């Protein structure tokens, strides 16, 4: 049997476009991303459009190509605004019927054209199916409905059609045609299955109604020269044919109902409609336009179908007329009075969402090409959703923590499960400390022994005392030598008294000694604290070192119990072994029941924590960005509704947590009742005193060692502070020692120069006096001579006949060639070169702050007074306003005013600089007290000839007196510093070095080391 021809819609054609460049520009300008990262995605989208242009119109592959491109356009529209203002791409499509081109920049136009082609492909695919086979018939039935659904989507979503094929009137006509053909296909299946006549009549009536709607639209579009005229002929023929079928099958149904008169009337109507259809089919053109998608034999097929149907109707009409005339004699109603045939719809438009029902849409459309690009609006919505998730997780976490806290508090109140150990008799055998006790022991063992620290402190204190004693002796020795030289030379010894210059140094020494005394008292307090807790600390240290912490705790508890007079003296029998038979449950059974409930509670807690963990993990991995992107256009209207809908996925976890809380409450009530019954048992009450005694002993032991540990922490802090203090104090003492040595060395050098000056002055005086006496003797001899001398000098006027003595000269003849001419400068403080000794480092007294001390107070961690001393590289000593100038060190060029000095404490650096750390300003010209006249500079030594040596006996005495008063004196048998015999004829080592350098022409301090 030849199947009836079906109308299929032609496809729209389009011109080529380029997606790549516009998309890359937009990604660069709007999203600020590198467009080359999306080069492959842009090329893929471009290739999809090329493939879509060549899609086959009668296959599922062509449909899938179109739908894949359309799906990517939908996803693209959520991220990229393709229009005339943003991504400007001209889409050119040709009308499917008139072939007129239409160009727009709107992505909606592109999508509507794609959907139109999908509908056209579906209609072509349905029209070409072999409906004589069941599979082909089902495919045609589904495809016609799907085509109608796609046309319906265009009609509902694209209101302003730019071309005639997309206009609402045209699309509605196409919907009617597709639905009518789907109804016809379904009718063919029912006729082939020989269904009841009444059903077939209703299906035919519905098909006729759909064709009637199509005729109206096709007639209008033919008038507008949009559709081909052959389409109007086909729908008109099928309209009459379907109406004739409806009347025919309804007549058969009336015959079955013994309504022969009505049946005859319907057959007469069917005969007239069949004749009209056959007439139109015979007038169908033999050649059809290519754009109509109809075959050339379409007219012959329709003519044959209508002819066969007309013959069938005529035959049945003759049969019924004969039977009615002979048997039934029922009246035949008029055509106008015949009731219309009821309609039964069997076809409806399939929505786009159901087009691929039962299939993997992701497989057809492919992955989202631009999934890595998330619009800002979607990101903001995703952040809001994340906050909603966080609120939910926080609420459930708080609920779980509350439930766990309630369980812990209840068990702690009931003293479970620890109380069960007592009842089972295992408490004495396994008394274990808590983790805090173990931590205390390990911490005590990890620290350095306090005894070693005390030994270190004692050693440091002795060393500091030795340094202070040495410095004090040096100052005393220097002062003693200075005063001895003053006593020997009287007014000629013009060196300043040492007592006026060593006030600051001696004050530092005194204050350092006082600070050591205060520190010793603090050390004593620390030692007292150690002795008070030494036993407990030693026990804790040894237990941690030997891994016997548990044994220590158990011994301490047993010892505490023995020393407690209120504790039971004898061990009571084990409750599990006691024999009480009062007819009730045994203690073992009651304990077992309590343990079972505790196990159930533990499982509830474990399950609750696991559910919470699963909830957190699921919430963390939950990402609805794609859902938000798909709903981007409508998210503003129902954002909260969407969030609540998505949060429902966590509802099962929430319900499980609520159930766990209810189960815990029930188990806690059961546990309370069961455990109270156990405690009320007379066999259990007999053991209460023993349990309480153990608890008291355990608490007492923990408190004792806790107190010892706290004292240990205080002791350790005090000892560490003391170590730091003694370390800083030793540095200060060593700095003071170097300052004292520098002072003494400077005083020695100053004394040596002064001694040289005195010796030179005395030698000059002796030489002048001898010359004067010789002149006087010569004059006397001349007067006593009997021979007059013509060369006798004339007496000087105004001299009374007495010759004028030669003036005294204190300068040697060759002194003008020596570098000692620098001594003629009047400023005493600047007549020494600025070359520091080997042991002295240049120092800026105003620009360097001393290192702050560590705090040290073992008893209260407070501060204990302690002194401060200038650093070892200090080059000036502070003097008060009423003091005489001090002898400067070799590199000092000025004196600095003293600053207030107060006794400091351990770790108090501010005491060293009471003025807020501001450096003291030195006086460039040096400080000279009123009435002080510096001594005159010593003259240089006389010129030396080859192998000539000049001896100054006085220097030996001064050099020896600094170490031993007997060294260097005339007649003394002791040797000098270099092992030579002391005497007036041998210069000291410094004088030898001075002579070797040409009378001090090099460095006048070169012999300083000899005076140390």
From Swiss-Prot:
Record field: compositional bias (Gly residues): 970-985
Function: Involved in concentration and sorting of cargo proteins of the multivesicular body (MVB) for incorporation into intralumenal vesicles.
PANTHER family tied to this protein: PCD6 INTERACTING PROTEIN-RELATED (PTHR23030), TYROSINE-PROTEIN PHOSPHATASE NON-RECEPTOR TYPE 23 (PTHR23030:SF30)
Main subcellular location of this protein, as a coarse class: cytoplasm
Keyword tags: Coiled coil, Cytoplasm, Endosome, Protein transport, Transport
Organism expressing this protein natively: Neurospora crassa (strain ATCC 24698 / 74-OR23-1A / CBS 708.71 / DSM 1257 / FGSC 987)
Compositional bias segments (type: Low complexity): 844-857, 914-930
Similarity-based family: Belongs to the BRO1 family.
Annotated spans, Disordered: 558-578, 784-812, 827-1012
Any one GO CC term of the record: endosome
Record's compositionally biased regions (Polar residues): 827-842, 892-913
Segments forming domain BRO1: 5-407
Bridged cysteine pairs (disulfide): none
InterPro entries given in the database record: ALIX_V_dom (IPR025304), BRO1_dom (IPR004328), BRO1_sf (IPR038499)
GO biological process: protein transport to vacuole involved in ubiquitin-dependent protein catabolic process via the multivesicular body sorting pathway
Coiled coil regions in record: 301-330, 719-775
Designated name of the protein: Vacuolar protein-sorting protein bro-1
Superkingdom in the source lineage: Eukaryota
């Amino acid at each position: 049997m030849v199947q009836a021809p079906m109308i299929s819609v032609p496809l729209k054609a389009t011109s080529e476009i380029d997606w790549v460049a516009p998309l890359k520009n937009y990604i660069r300008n709007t999203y600020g991303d590198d467009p080359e990262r999306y080069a492959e995605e842009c090329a893929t989208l471009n290739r999809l459009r090329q493939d879509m242009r060549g899609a086959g119109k009668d296959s599922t592959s062509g449909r899938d190509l179109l739908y894949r491109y359309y799906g990517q356009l939908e996803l693209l529209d959520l991220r990229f605004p393709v229009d005339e203002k943003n991504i400007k791409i001209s889409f050119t499509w040709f009308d499917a019927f008139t072939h007129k081109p239409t160009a727009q920049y709107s992505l909606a136009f592109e999508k509507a054209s794609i959907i139109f082609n999908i509908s056209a492909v579906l209609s072509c695919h349905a029209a070409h199916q072999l409906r004589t086979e069941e599979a082909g018939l089902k495919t045609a039935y589904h495809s016609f409905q799907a085509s109608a659904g796609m046309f319906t989507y265009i009609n509902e979503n694209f209101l302003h059609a730019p071309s005639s094929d997309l206009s609402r009137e045209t699309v509605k006509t196409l919907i009617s045609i597709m639905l009518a053909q789907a109804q016809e296909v379904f009718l063919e299946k029912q006729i082939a299955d020989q269904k009841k006549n009444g059903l077939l009549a209703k299906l035919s009536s519905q098909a006729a109604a759909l064709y009637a709607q199509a005729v109206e639209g096709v007639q209008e579009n033919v008038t507008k020269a949009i559709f081909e005229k052959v389409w109007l002929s086909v729908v008109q023929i099928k309209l009459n044919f379907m109406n004739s079928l409806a009347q025919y099958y309804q007549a058969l149904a009336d015959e079955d109902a013994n309504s022969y008169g009505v049946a005859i009337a319907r057959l007469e109507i069917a005969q007239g409609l069949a004749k009209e259809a056959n007439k139109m089919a015979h007038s169908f053109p033999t050649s059809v336009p290519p754009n109509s998608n109809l075959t050339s034999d379409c007219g012959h097929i329709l003519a044959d179908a209508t002819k066969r149907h007309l013959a069938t109707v005529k035959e049945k009409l003759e049969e019924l007329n004969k039977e009615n005339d002979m048997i039934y004699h029922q009246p035949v109603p008029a055509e106008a009075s015949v009731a219309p045939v009821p309609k039964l719809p069997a076809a409806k438009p399939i929505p786009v969402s159901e087009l691929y029902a039962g299939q993997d849409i992701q497989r057809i459309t492919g992955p989202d090409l631009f999934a890595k690009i998330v619009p800002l609006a979607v990101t903001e919505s995703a952040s809001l959703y994340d906050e909603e998730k966080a609120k939910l997780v926080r609420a459930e976490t708080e609920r779980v923590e509350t439930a766990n806290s309630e369980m812990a508090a209840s068990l702690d109140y009931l003293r479970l499960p620890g109380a069960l150990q007592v009842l089972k008799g295992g408490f004495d055998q396994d008394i274990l400390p808590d983790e805090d006790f173990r931590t205390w022991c390990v911490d005590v063992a990890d620290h350095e022994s306090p005894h070693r620290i005390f030994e270190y402190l004692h050693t440091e204190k002795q060393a500091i005392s030795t340094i202070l004693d040495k410095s004090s002796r040096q100052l005393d020795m220097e002062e003693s030598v200075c005063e001895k030289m003053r006593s020997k030379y009287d007014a000629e010894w013009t060196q300043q008294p040492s007592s006026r210059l060593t006030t600051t140094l001696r004050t530092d020494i005194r204050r350092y000694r006082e600070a050591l005394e205060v520190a010793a008292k603090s050390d004593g307090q620390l030692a007292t604290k150690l002795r008070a807790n030494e036993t407990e600390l030693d026990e804790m240290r040894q237990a941690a070192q030997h891994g016997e912490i548990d044994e220590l705790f158990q011994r301490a508890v047993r010892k505490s119990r023995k020393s407690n007079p209120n504790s039971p003296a004898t061990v009571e029998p084990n409750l599990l072994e006691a024999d009480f038979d009062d007819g009730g449950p045994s203690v073992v059974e009651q304990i077992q029941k309590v343990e079972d409930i505790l196990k159930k509670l533990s499982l509830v807690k474990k399950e609750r924590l696991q559910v919470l963990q699963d909830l957190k993990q699921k919430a963390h991995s939950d990402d609805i960005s794609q859902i938000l992107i798909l709903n981007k256009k409508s998210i503003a209207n129902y954002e909260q509704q969407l969030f609540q809908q998505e949060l429902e996925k966590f509802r099962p976890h929430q319900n499980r947590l609520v159930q766990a809380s209810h189960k815990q409450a029930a188990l806690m009530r059961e546990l309370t009742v069961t455990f109270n019954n156990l405690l009320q048992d007379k066999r259990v009450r007999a053991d209460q005193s023993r349990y309480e005694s153990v608890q008291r002993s355990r608490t007492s032991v923990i408190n004792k060692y806790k107190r010892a540990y706290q004292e240990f922490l205080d002791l350790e802090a005090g000892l560490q502070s003391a170590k730091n203090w003694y370390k800083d104090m030793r540095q200060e003492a060593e700095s003071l020692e170097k300052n004292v040595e520098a002072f003494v060395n400077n005083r020695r050098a100053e004394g040596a120069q002064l001694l040289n000056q005195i010796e030179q002055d005395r030698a000059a005086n002796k030489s002048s006096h001898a010359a004067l006496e010789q002149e006087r003797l010569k004059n006397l001899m001349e007067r006593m001579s009997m021979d007059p001398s013509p060369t006798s000098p004339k007496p000087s006027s105004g001299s009374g006949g007495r010759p004028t003595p030669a003036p005294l000269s204190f300068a040697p003849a060759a002194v003008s060639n020596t570098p000692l001419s620098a001594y003629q400068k009047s400023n005493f403080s600047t007549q020494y070169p600025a070359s520091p000794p080997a042991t002295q480092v240049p120092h800026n007294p105003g620009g360097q702050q001393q290192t702050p001390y560590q705090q040290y107070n073992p008893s209260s961690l407070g501060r204990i007074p302690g002194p401060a001393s200038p650093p070892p590289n200090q080059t000036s000593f502070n003097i008060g306003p009423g003091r005489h100038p001090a002898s400067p060190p070799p590199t000092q060029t000025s004196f600095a005013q003293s600053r207030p000095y107060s006794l400091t404490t351990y770790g108090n650096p501010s005491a060293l600089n009471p003025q807020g750390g501001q450096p003291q300003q030195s006086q460039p010209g040096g400080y000279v007290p009123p009435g002080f006249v510096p001594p005159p500079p010593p003259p240089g030594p006389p010129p030396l000839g080859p192998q000539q040596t000049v001896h100054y006996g006085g220097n030996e005495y001064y050099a020896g007196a600094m170490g031993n008063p007997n060294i260097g004196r005339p007649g003394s048998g002791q040797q000098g510093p270099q092992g030579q015999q002391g005497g007036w004829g041998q210069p000291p080592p410094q004088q030898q070095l001075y002579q070797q350098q040409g009378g001090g022409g090099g460095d006048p301090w070169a012999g300083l080391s000899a005076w140390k």
